[in-house]
Amino acid sequence: MKLVFLFFIVAVMVSLFVGMTEADKPRFLTTVCQDTYEKCKEQMLKKDKK
């Protein structure tokens, strides 16, 4: 889970540098958040099955 959290922080940092235009920033952040959320959900489902 630490790796996912670290990836999220890096992605946010990258989004701030890369997506400087206001139109791109929310779209990029939304994609990152959804991607991170899906990964977290998968991890939680795997834990529940054990």
Swiss-Prot record:
Q: In which tissues is it expressed?
A: Expressed by the venom apparatus.
Q: Does the keyword Cell division apply?
A: no
Q: Name one GO molecular function term.
A: toxin activity
Could you confirm whether the keyword NADP appears in this record? no
Q: Which GO terms describe its cellular component?
A: extracellular region
Keyword annotations for this protein, in alphabetical order, are: Cleavage on pair of basic residues, Disulfide bond, Secreted, Signal, Toxin
* Span of the signal peptide: 1-23
Spell out the disulfide connections: 33-40
* Free-text function comment from the UniProt entry: Probable toxin.
Family per UniProt?
A: Belongs to the caterpillar 9 family.
Protein's UniProt name: U-megalopygitoxin(9)-Mo13
Q: What organism is the protein native to?
A: Megalopyge opercularis (Southern flannel moth)
